[in-house]
Amino acid sequence: MKRVLWITPSILPSSGGQAMHSLGYIRALSKVCELKVIARATLGELKQVESDSSMFQGLDVTLVRAYKFNSKFNKVRQPISKWISHNSGVMVPYRNIANTIKNVVKNFEPDIVVIDYIGMYNYYTLTKKMCPHARFVYVSHNVEFKNFTDIKTSAEKKSFASNFWIEKRKKYEERMLCESDASLCISNSDIDIFKAEFPTTKKLVFAKPLIKFAKIKSKEDLRKFGKKLLVVGSMDWYPNVNGIEWFVEDVFIPLAKSDPEYKLYLVGRKPDDRIKKLGEKCENIIVTGSVDSVDPYYKECDVSIIPVFEGTGAKIKVLESLGKGIPTVCSDFAAKDYLLNNGEMMVVPQNAKAFESAINKLKSSLETRMAIYDKMEQYMENYYEINPEIVKLFE
């Protein structure tokens, strides 16, 4: 079996979509190779793992704090490091993590090194020197430079500084894609962008999310329709903020005016000011902020709404809605990587009438809700087969 070292910024599911995607592949690939994982972790995450020893059961995972001691120097360094990482998209190298990598490489001698996420670029350059004969695989979670460009363009007029950081990110991404022996890309659309932007990229392989979600809704739950709509996601991520704002203004507020019994739950961490204002504007909108578990909301609500029309990467909330068993109205943009061709959810364009019509159909037709539930179950039964091209890379 090949010896594989996987270096990642986080694999705790609570950290978000990137971590969940990574953990899905780590679990799958640990069956075909000897896999060691080095993951950065905060003190809170280390305590979380201590309290739940089953979290990484069967996996060889080393969690490392970026800072070993809470010294005065580190208290000064931390905000500076965060500022640099925020702008460059690349984590400042920490001695504690670097030393852990050196020790593992020395004893393990990996055949393959996986650099998970562009933020680990500095650890790529370090490991490349230490493992000159190893093959390198890069895991791309988004087209980072494009997302960053979109954020800067929407937030402000491009300044010299913002242009500098955009180009910096683009160079990091180009090096990772062009120098790695293969890259795993979460979206086919991302692959198309990379090929057009960086013609010398090597092997780009589609790596659909393998995250497993526990089913929350039963078929019996669908018999009642309480007019409760749900949007789940990071409430500070610009595609979510823009999409939710459009949905509320163009679809939900008119819907709630015609039928005041409708409620919309916006569930997710770090709600942007624009999201908070939506809750203040309409009393039928509940902005929860961060919650311990989204499961009670999936259980209680009738329809999941995914109003995303921009951004790169896979939209993991599509898979989450399918896995949780909730009837869903989803933009065709968000659904494009999932091949939903058999009525597994209501896939619609960015059109207010289309969204409203889909919601009304789910409200008025128990038969439609039941049929969608059955189609979701069938889809999920066949979904989790890993791409054979990926298996070949690690055998």
Stretches found by the model and what they are:
Residues 1-62:
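N-terminal subdomain of nucleotide-sugar transferases
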Residues 9, 71-89, 137-171, 234:
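Acceptor-binding helix/loop patch of EC 2.4 sugar-transfer enzymes
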Residues 163-166, 170, 174-216:
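Donor nucleotide-sugar binding/catalytic pocket of nucleotide-sugar-dependent glycosyltransferases
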Residues 181, 299-313, 324-326:
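Acidic donor-binding loop of glycosyltransferase active sites
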Residues 206-278, 287-295, 299:
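Conserved catalytic-core segment of nucleotide-activated headgroup transferases in glycan assembly
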Residues 317-320, 327-331:
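Short hydrophobic beta-strand element within catalytic cores of glycosyltransferases
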Residues 345-353, 360-366:
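Conserved acidic donor-binding segment of nucleotide-sugar-dependent glycosyltransferases
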Residues 367-395:
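A charged, aromatic-enriched C-terminal amphipathic alpha-helix characteristic of glycosyltransferases
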